[in-house]
Amino acid sequence: MKEYYQENHRKYYDQTFSIDPTSFLLPLARCLHPGSTILDVGCGSGRDMRWLKDQGFQPEGFERSQGLAGLARAHSGCPVLEGDFEVHDFSGMKMDAILLVGALVHVPHEHFKKVFENILRALKPGGYVLLTLKEGIQDTGISGGRIFYQWLDEYLRKAIDHLNLSVVDFSRQVSKIRKTDVWLGYVLKKQEGLL
């Protein structure tokens, strides 16, 4: 699965870059001040970084696929760090916001807490997270050996309940690529004075 995005980076870019991200990025953007730093984890094609940069923010990307990282740099004009977010040490970063748009859909439920907590180390106290995950009760396999782990709202809220995050905004949106998919969107705020 990890190789899918490297081997298919151009196809993935072509499929996702032209989608207008306004509907799912605007709830986060409204919480931030101009110039806020944003880490886009699993930045993919760079589409969301480009939109955020155009709104006056300072996005940086983090991407596992070397091919996607190169395309994201070229088309967003933003720096992109290459690495595996499941093991990367994020504790040296202090960002105003973190973007996780579909980035955690391939993380099994039993690993979600550990991976999410690791990424949250990059967030300043009082910072925001945009988290989107597919809604559903079954895990669905798609071409290339990718497995998409789906969530119900109530279970996801329980999974993040202990993380000192409050839900600022919640949405359900039909996928712009596959009309049978619904994405759960959460803008979360990290409590002040907490790690």
Which stretches of residues belong to each language-model region?
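A short SAM/SAH-binding and catalytic strip from SAM-dependent methyltransferases
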Residues: 96-111
